[in-house]
Amino acid sequence: MSTGPGKKAIRNAGGVGGGAGPSAGGPRGPAGQAVKFARRTSSGRYVSLSREDIDMEGELAADYTNYTVQIPPTPDNQPMLNGAEPASVAMKAEEQYVSNSLFTGGFNSATRAHLMDKVIESSVSHPQMAGAKGSRCAMPACDGSAMRNERGEDVDPCECHFKICRDCYLDAQKDGCICPGCKEHYKIGEYADDDPHDGKLHLPGPGGGGNKSLLARNQNGEFDHNRWLFESSGTYGYGNAFWPKGGMYDDDLDDDVDKLGGDGGGGGGGGPLPEQKPFKPLTRKIPMPTSVISPYRIFIVIRMFVLLFYLTWRIRNPNMEALWLWGMSIVCELWFAFSWLLDMLPKVNPVNRSTDLAVLKEKFETPSPSNPHGRSDLPGLDVFVSTADPEKEPVLTTATTILSILAVDYPVEKLACYVSDDGGALLTFEAMAEAASFANVWVPFCKKHDIEPRNPDSYFSVKGDPTKGKRRNDFVKDRRRVKREFDEFKVRINGLPDSIRRRSDAFNAREDMKMLKHLRETGADPSEQPKVKKATWMADGSHWPGTWAASAPDHAKGNHAGILQVMLKPPSPDPLYGMHDDDQMIDFSDVDIRLPMLVYMSREKRPGYDHNKKAGAMNALVRCSAVMSNGPFMLNFDCDHYINNAQAVREAMCFFMDRGGERIAYIQFPQRFEGIDPSDRYANNNTVFFDGNMRALDGLQGPMYVGTGCMFRRFAVYGFDPPRTAEYTGWLFTKKKVTTFKDPESDTQTLKAEDFDAELTSHLVPRRFGNSSPFMASIPVAEFQARPLADHPAVLHGRPSGALTVPRPPLDPPTVAEAVSVISCWYEDKTEWGDRVGWIYGSVTEDVVTGYRMHNRGWRSVYCITKRDAFLGTAPINLTDRLHQVLRWATGSVEIFFSRNNAFLASRKLMLLQRISYLNVGIYPFTSIFLLVYCFIPALSLFSGFFIVQKLDIAFLCYLLTMTITLVALGILEVKWSGIELEDWWRNEQFWLISGTSAHLYAVVQGLLKVMAGIEISFTLTAKAAADDNEDIYADLYIVKWSSLLIPPITIGMVNIIAIAFAFARTIYSDNPRWGKFIGGGFFSFWVLAHLNPFAKGLMGRRGKTPTIVFVWSGLLSITVSLLWVAISPPEANSNGGARGGGFQFP
């Protein structure tokens, strides 16, 4: 079979496309269909060829040099698309051109492709990577790279093996298709006829498939929005070209489905029956043991009644001696009871879940009649990594995160990774290129030896025996080689800042010399020379289009063009094994060496446009990925979170692909952290929330979205409702009403726009999503590909098996140019991005708001806890940094409370207990007001000599004992069903008081200022520390950073200590000591101080050193106690030489 361009047959199913009817002329295919021939023009369009054109061998015009197959596949007519068939030369050239070009564009500027033969200064070997080494073009005066295939081997369009680059090859086509080497016509090979029964269903690409005309941006609004799949005869579903009503299936199919109890659904019960196999679920919901959860619920009810009786008793028995103290305490206790209810009620139904990866593999990656070659039928996945400042977020951390993603255990051809650099820094760009280069060694090594974790920095830092469980004889040799390569990689990364600076200084000096030379030649005055801009230069000797080290117009952090670079081009559809070469240090001959697609993106920023911080960057990633790869699912990470479990993605996919998966909007993984001090002084692990609260929400409508480590359904992010929605009506929203589509017939057809959103009409589509035809064409494709298999009658709106086994279309320049357009600063103007579509704007906690909107539309979410932690990240262990982090979260909660995202205003699609949990999110910061007052009440009691009750009678003590016992019992039971440690629970309680009296209080003040005075709130990016190998990883724990957030807890601690000393001295020297009230007030003061213990340790700095503050406190306390002693009981001796009554008497 020829590797050059050739003719391919284009078959059209009946009624689809021109000339497809039975009367159409021309030869017939094996299925009795008309056969047409087509050529692909230089503009990307497909033009039909007549029989006369085909017979004109050797006389084709330049446009006739590239042919491709365009077969509308159906179960009757399915193309042969195996990876052994080579792509056309021109297509390979376009792929190479895309991967070697840096695309820029944006506001009032044309999109440009800058061809880069050199991306980084180090050599590049992997054929998928931009700037990969290879032969040079043999044309005179041309220094371009010769065209290459997926192995990096030269592509020779002529038998004379003349090396030629893409541009020269296109020029040769225009000059009569004559090879510049042998001066003969390029020979056009013939492809064998395709097997019509390959068993694969073809899907158009994200930009409209083979219709390249859609890839050009439609500025005139000519796109037909009524055709974008949301129509009765769309592209997918039962009853169209991809799933015919008749033909190869029995006419009694619907009767069979009815007997099974199915009601159809766009490829669900109404489609063809799958192979008759016993249905195997991919997931299981495991309820908590009754012996644990039943007592837990009982104790909640008991404590509710105890609190009710206690508060009633307190209100009916005021302390008349100190009404002011009694009033303050009553108000605080009422709020605490209300807050406790909001926190505990959503915890009544925690669940566990499990997945079956073996069943997932059996369903989606095992050969079957619908998938004879065993290609992966799993949906695509786009992974997002966001970073903003390489100075605060070390590029080495970001690079190792990228490497862990590229090595994840998921079909390579279905995976794509996008890096959003909101700072537009060349340092981040070159670090990503270095990571792509190192992935050539790291990813095959991980696959060959089943490495965990797949972050190289973490893997080589793990203590223990690295050979445990390894059976291959060459593991030790391979590991030693990769370790050396990684050390060299780290050195290159660490040297990038200096390398970029030296390079830029050298080029800027050259430009200065050129300017001086020009001035001398023109005779101008050198003293009046114009100032040359100090640019930042790329490795190929051109200006970096992003942010420069010395800010300049169009090259600043808030003012630069959009940048897009395909670091690793999309892989070939079939496995590509390494070559057995003695020169290679590592043998990858039995390892698939393909790498997932990797894209660097920096969205355009201009003055006058609100960039909306991280939410805006995420929305730009959503649009960019939709145009380029359009994975129906998206996984987002912060740059400091990496994949710790290579199987985690598959476990999440089990939930999406199982029964009921079509109603799941996202899968949230728990956040786990490394580098936390062993005692977890400031509750950084937050296990009570991630293992307790989130697991409990999983038993309701689902966990909240918490910012990172979350896999989304793309269609849900677009603001659509789920296919089946439950409304909760009646008293306390307890009555569940399930609503489906209005028209029962729609379950056997492609879904319409009004099925998902009754308000969405064709003319409103651009207003909602923006004026990008390829983007809008990608939406229905993503919806279809995200459906679970229609292998069970309960699966509504499923898809047939084998529908996703075809390779994705290759990237071409118009597609990448459109991706640059959708990340421009003006694209979101007058659209619903950030309001209804994508990540929601207007809050510093955009993650919680985005998840809330999805739940409010009726979507569900799932909490996926894996045996091995799925993802690991870093967290600030310094006290001040931790408080600032909590301040940002709490400020976002206050914003939510005063916005239309308040759970009070939620729709009926939100469950009652889920509504309460979201209500608690907006209310919890206000607890800080009452907590601050309550922490001062013990001190005020000790100073005044009164207590919150008139006397410590038996009733008060019984209530206090009962509430304490129920609180401890609930804590123990919660520890048992959530799997956390009792120490973690206590640390959480301590930090609740610390943050409640500092960060939460400031958040309330800031939120009120924003709502009432319109004062905007700005937060600085939390710095991620990158410790050296020999540095103490806990060094930051002992650093004392002064902040105003520290003032309230310090004041509370000092006041309570002084109050205890004051009351103790007064009681001892009192004529009538009242020890009961002192013990009552002293007990609560000690309780407050016990909660502040981690805070005090944080102020004392490093262990083993006595900081100055200790001496200051000691001196202050000594002076205070001495003065109180003298003031209360002056040393006045009586005639017997004894002290006054009530004091000590020495012998």
Curated annotation (Swiss-Prot):
Cleaved signal peptide residues: none
Molecular-function annotations in GO: cellulose synthase (UDP-forming) activity
Positions of the UniProt region annotated as Disordered: 1-33, 259-281
Active site: 422, 847
UniProt keyword list: Cell wall biogenesis/degradation, Glycosyltransferase, Golgi apparatus, Membrane, Transferase, Transmembrane, Transmembrane helix
Subcellular location, record wording: Golgi apparatus membrane
Enzyme class: transferase
Protein's UniProt name: Cellulose synthase-like protein D3
Gene (name only): CSLD3
